[in-house]
Amino acid sequence: MKLSAIWESKNGLRGSGTCSHRRVSTPDIQSPDCGEGGIGHALALDFKNQGYVVFTTLLAHEPRDHLTDLGIHSFTADVTKDSDIEQLKEAISSLTEGSLSVLVNNAGICYTMTAIDTDVKEVEKMFGVNVFGPMRMVHIFHPLLIKARGKIVNIGSELTDFEASYNATKAALHHWGNTLRVEMKPLGVEVVNVISGEVGTNILKRDHNRKLPEDSFYRPLEKEFMNHVTRTPRTTTPAEYSRSVVIEVMKQHSTAWFWTGASSGIVRFSEQFFPRTLWVNSL
């Protein structure tokens, strides 16, 4: 579990410690993306390159030299634990004068399996990170966001084959974000859903050895399944993806639904102008 927090002052003296601050927090929750080459790492670098002071959190066993060597601060925290995030909030609040202008929820674990072959315990674990993690972050950090009249950015995803449960976590995040947007508007906080196309990260690494059950009805598709879980996406890079997200987040008013990443344009077009059953014959 990883979280990045970024802040700068409104008067351009970034990280100056003045009274008028614009602060950004980017949680990268239980994801490889804050490791080198991932989305979280790219976001931290992009905000850093914009002159922000960046705070990140990782699990105790995770290396952080690639962040701290660049002046990016690092905390140890597990964002599935209330106590860890409460402590994190107090630590960040003490450094940012109690306000935060953007919280980016980038849930990141994946469980690849056909819907009818799913191990529900794995799905519960994934929901704990991908859905309940962002909920916990917003619940605990909302006073800082309201004080700053800030933004909440939820990193979502397009649908993909063999990912019914992962798709469900992202659908939950999208719809929760839609309701959250309505509820936070009177409090002066914007909510942005980022709908991500495929990005070249190692999120599938934990699934590389996953196989279909021996008694699965999908055994004839074993080759296609293995190609899916072992592939290395060579499409949008984390750096390209991050740049587009950071540019959108830094706007005075961000788009409610922001599509970015490989194939996001064609998927968005298809969802708007074609029947929902368009993808039924994709396998």
UniProtKB/Swiss-Prot annotation:
InterPro entries: NAD(P)-bd_dom_sf, Sc_DH/Rdtase_CS, SDR_fam. This is Short-chain dehydrogenase anuB. NADP(+) binds at residues 57, 78, 106, 166, 170, 199, 201. GO terms for molecular function: acylglycerone-phosphate reductase (NADP+) activity; triacylglycerol lipase activity. Keywords: NADP, Oxidoreductase. GO terms for cellular component: endoplasmic reticulum; lipid droplet. GO terms for biological process: phosphatidic acid biosynthetic process; secondary metabolite biosynthetic process; triglyceride catabolic process. The active site is at 166 (proton acceptor), 166 (proton donor), 170 (lowers pka of active site tyr). Belongs to the short-chain dehydrogenases/reductases (SDR) family. Pathway: Secondary metabolite biosynthesis. It is an enzyme of class 1 (oxidoreductase). The gene is anuB. The lineage of its organism: Eukaryota, Fungi, Dikarya, Ascomycota, Pezizomycotina. It holds the Pfam family adh_short. Its EC number is 1.1.1.-. Highly reducing polyketide synthase; part of the gene cluster that mediates the biosynthesis of annullatin D, an alkylated aromatic polyketide with a fused dihydrobenzofuran lactone ring system that exhibits potent agonistic activities toward the cannabinoid receptors.
